[in-house]
């Protein structure tokens, strides 16, 4: 009896500002823990990871997944390309004399497929090593003027006293075959093409690494007299000022031809990857 009173009294004692709470009962140890229903913890064999005797969860096959997705989306999947093939483009390569336009063109011809290099018609005499129909179509002055009269040329110009022009038919035929077109023209021809084609063509300006390097190349060609060299160098200085009218500039440094050609290829790849493609009509 006394023990009960003491217990009751101890539960109600409150020290000043410090109440003491004595629990009425203490947690009891878990009884019969070993007797918990094994069936409530046991996983079936088919759900035990790593169990060699478990059956793999059956997943739908790829065709079944596709059919299910199509049904839920309400439309069928198509194997057609997400985007159409890129348009054919016209690449205009130009630059002053002595920058290596022909070297870049010839190397590009070796390493890049899907390009047609337009052969320009000219009234000038053939130089040593040149091949008619490959380097130029060599025609007489009268023949050239006849082509002009019949509107067979996309553009033409009088350069250093000789005519040069681009045949239309050649471009149309190869674009119809799906090939991109490369035009190698002088600065005057590039200006004319810019007026005709506007922004539908890609204009690349080739330059040497320095003016001195450009002049040395002209001298090394040994195709002009001193007076002719003077005219070409003076003209080249003027032509460099037209760089701002081009889309891209590529430096063709001595001994770095591959680098220049790689740059031109990168430009072509970038143009073919544009969301808004250029459209050429000739």
Swiss-Prot record:
The keyword ATP-binding applies. Its EC number is 2.7.4.8. Keywords: ATP-binding, Chloroplast, Kinase, Nucleotide-binding, Plastid, Transferase, Transit peptide. SMART domains: GuKc. InterPro entries: GK/Ca_channel_bsu, Guanylate_kin-like_dom, Guanylate_kinase, Guanylate_kinase_CS, P-loop_NTPase. GO terms for cellular component: chloroplast. Residues 88-269 form the Guanylate kinase-like domain. It comes from the Eukaryota. ATP binds at residues 95-102, 252. One of its GO terms (biological process) is regulation of developmental growth. One of its GO terms (molecular function) is ATP binding. It catalyses: GMP + ATP = GDP + ADP. PANTHER family: GUANYLATE KINASE (PTHR23117:SF13), GUANYLATE KINASE-RELATED (PTHR23117). Belongs to the guanylate kinase family. Plants silencing GK3 have dwarf phenotype and develop albino cotyledons and leaves. This is Guanylate kinase 3, chloroplastic. It comes from Arabidopsis thaliana.
